[in-house]
Amino acid sequence: MSKFATALQLDLPDWLRHTLNEDRLYSDDESRVALTIDLALRNVENATGGPFGAAVFTADGRLVSAGVNRVLPQNCSVAHAEMMAYMLAQARVQRSRLNENGERFVLATSAQPCCQCYGATFWAGIDELLIGARTEDVEELTEFEEGPLPADWIGELEARGIAVRRDILRDSARGVFLRYRELGGQRY
């Protein structure tokens, strides 16, 4: 019998499904990022993963998917909040590129994407990226290494039709990292 894995399953914590409200309309950027910060904090408080949250919305503010960081519980380096949100959104709409039919999508994230999630953003099919904390906040408060980005990373996204807005509720997002550190969160 082969010892090679031929299937993979990534799960979000049980508390997440009880937290999300599919009927709610997130009509502004602040409410969308606030959700991701709340998810990140719950993930830390419940000890179910790292201090990051992300969500995909339609342009009019309907929640399509949400994710939290599950790297350590899932033993999977790609189980970042943004990646989880992208994969779940793609599964829900049944398209590998969310916006390929002209519908517009937004990714809100509690922190600036690392190099992995930044790269995935080009192909995920989103039209707008909303960011809470900056990379320097993550690295200063958690000692995580977020990896290299192009010097003009925002310009690279915008050149491909992805609008970027950052520093949305930045202080609140930074608070999640402080709480993670306070609770002895593991660096990975």
Feature-to-residue mapping (PLM):
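Short, thiol/selenol-centered motifs that function as redox-active sites or metal-ligating centers
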Residues: 107-124
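Conserved hydrophobic/aromatic pocket- or pore-lining residues that grip, position, or stack substrates
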Residues: 36, 53, 85
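Zinc-dependent deaminase
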Residues: 1-43, 103, 120, 124-188
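Mobile, glycine- and charge-enriched loop segments
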Residues: 86-111
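Short beta-strand scaffold segments in enzyme catalytic cores
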Residues: 52-61
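Short loop/turn motifs at secondary-structure junctions and domain boundaries
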Residues: 45-48
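A short, polar/charged loop-to-alpha-helix boundary motif
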Residues: 70-84, 88
